[in-house]
């Protein structure tokens, strides 16, 4: 979950009621269908189906690339994945999404922070292998597809019943704090740690913090990118960066895909794995689907279009789900809709789908530049640690904001029990073995919250 995911989680809950009223449509939208519009919160210069002049369009597309870049590369760097694959998957995923939605929604898909904790734990439990992590994200994408079919057939009331704020809030907190120890270790705040690494982490943290609090305009949209660049330059000055990988890399290289079959050595291989480590990743879909609804509601208000009606929530979920499965199949992280790019649309007042499409093509091109991706791989762990301290903390804090914004009443014992059980089980290292399936961490926390919410009787104030 990136800063974009953090912000959109806040928007998701207080706008959910509006979103639920906007959900209709079909998987196949006839070309003759009347475009459904509402009052826009922004006076757009270019609407969704309009195109800018060629040169202006290229510049606008690069602006979207800059907006998504910091968060998109940070996820694979934290997880130890090839950055080139994440860039490739974000570009392909965006094009898949646009195809599924009939090129009607100006959304960019990038790496999702929500899955970092679960994927990292799956890798750790598998001895560093990515089998469970990649399989879990592939299946998560398929869950999106199933939910899309469910929305098409049965509407959305069942989603709202499963995902009240008292479940969503604690789950976000568990996701945010699940890897707090890893962030502290990477930052160098451990016994015997190098003071240089700790100093780099502090500088990186402060750059991101100041930009988030004082930045204006476009600077406010890309705090991750500026923080990574600033921390990296500082690390270079302290002699913590090794440029040998950049010197050895080719200018043009095929992205370092991981594939679930033997390619004769052309690419690395992982095996599809359906064990408990894989199952533990699936409940993350609960949070990301809710965020998906919130993101599209906000974008609908900016563009003055009811995207949850046309092309419909089922089609946007379908595109997001297929894109996520394809990314994981290729060895990349999960994809998600990016609020940073929605912010760019609000700032530039240009909602042209063609601009987003060209940004996706630029990301695809960057994934083949070997020197470029090698340079990114030289970013020290201390830079990532400084970013992660802020990132994980903000994610957890926004779980609290969800509870506050939705006015979850903790004077009611029912709500107190649900949140307490989720937090203790999610952060306390609890595991539950049910035959061949073992639930732990985020998965156990999510299932506990959902079950308690369904079975505990409601109280009156």
Residue ranges and their predicted role:
Residues 30-107, 114-126:
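N-terminal signal-anchor module of multipass membrane proteins
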Residues 36, 42, 207-210, 225-281, ...:
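Hydrophobic transmembrane alpha-helices of multi-pass solute/ion transporters
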Residues 55-71, 196-204, 222-223, 238, ...:
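Hydrophobic, membrane-embedded alpha-helices of multi-pass small-molecule transporters
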Residues 2-59, 245-266, 301-302, 308, ...:
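Intrinsically disordered, low-complexity non-transmembrane regions of multi-pass membrane transporters
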Residues 81-86, 103-115, 159-168, 220-225, ...:
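Short, non-helical or kinked segments that cap or interrupt transmembrane helices
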Residues 32, 42-55, 77-98, 280-353:
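Membrane-embedded helical hairpins/re-entrant loop segments and their flanking transmembrane helices
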Residues 41, 69-70, 204-214, 222, ...:
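Juxtamembrane interface elements at the cytosolic ends of transmembrane helices
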């Amino acid at each position: 979950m990136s800063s974009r995911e953090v912000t959109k989680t806040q928007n998701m809950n207080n706008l959910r009621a509006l979103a639920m009223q906007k959900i209709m449509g079909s998987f196949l939208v006839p070309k003759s269908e009347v475009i459904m519009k509402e009052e826009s919160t922004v006076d757009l210069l270019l609407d969704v189906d309009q195109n800018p002049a060629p040169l202006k369009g290229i510049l606008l597309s690069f602006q979207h690339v800059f907006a998504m870049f910091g968060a998109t590369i940070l996820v694979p760097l934290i997880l130890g994945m090839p950055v080139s694959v994440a860039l490739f998957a974000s570009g392909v995923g965006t094009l898949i999404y646009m195809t599924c939605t009939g090129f009607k929604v100006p959304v960019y898909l990038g790496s999702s922070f929500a899955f970092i904790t679960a994927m990292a734990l799956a890798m750790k439990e598998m001895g560093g292998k990515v089998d469970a992590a990649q399989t879990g994200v592939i299946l998560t994408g398929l869950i999106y597809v199933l939910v899309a079919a469910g929305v098409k057939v049965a509407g959305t009331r069942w989603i709202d019943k499963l995902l009240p704020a008292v479940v969503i809030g604690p789950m976000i907190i568990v996701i945010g704090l699940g890897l707090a120890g890893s962030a502290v270790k990477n930052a160098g705040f451990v016994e015997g740690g190098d003071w240089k690494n700790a100093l780099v982490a502090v500088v990186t943290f402060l750059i991101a913090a100041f930009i988030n609090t004082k930045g204006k305009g476009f600077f406010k949209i890309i705090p991750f990118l500026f923080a990574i660049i600033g921390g990296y330059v500082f690390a270079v000055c302290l002699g913590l960066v090794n440029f040998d990988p950049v010197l050895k890399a080719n200018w043009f290289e095929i992205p370092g895909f991981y594939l679930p079959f033997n390619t004769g050595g052309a690419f690395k291989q992982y095996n599809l794995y359906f064990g408990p480590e894989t199952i533990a990743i699936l409940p993350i879909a609960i949070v990301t689907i809710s965020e998906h609804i919130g993101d599209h509601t906000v974008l609908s208000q900016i563009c003055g279009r009811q995207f949850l009606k046309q092309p419909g929530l089922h089609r946007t979920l379908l595109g997001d789900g297929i894109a996520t499965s394809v990314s994981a199949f290729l060895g990349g992280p999960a994809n998600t809709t990016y609020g940073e790019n929605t912010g760019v649309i609000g700032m530039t007042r240009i909602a042209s789908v063609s601009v987003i499409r060209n940004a996706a093509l630029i990301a695809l091109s960057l994934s083949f530049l070997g020197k470029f991706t090698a340079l990114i791989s030289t970013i020290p762990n201390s830079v990532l640690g400084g970013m992660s301290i802020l990132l994980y903390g903000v994610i957890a804090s926004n779980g609290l904001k969800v509870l506050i914004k939705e006015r979850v009443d903790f004077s009611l014992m029912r709500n107190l029990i649900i949140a307490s059980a989720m937090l203790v089980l999610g952060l306390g290292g609890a595991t539950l073995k049910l035959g061949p399936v073992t639930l732990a961490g985020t998965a156990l926390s999510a299932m506990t919250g959902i079950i308690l919410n369904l079975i505990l009787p409601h109280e009156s104030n």
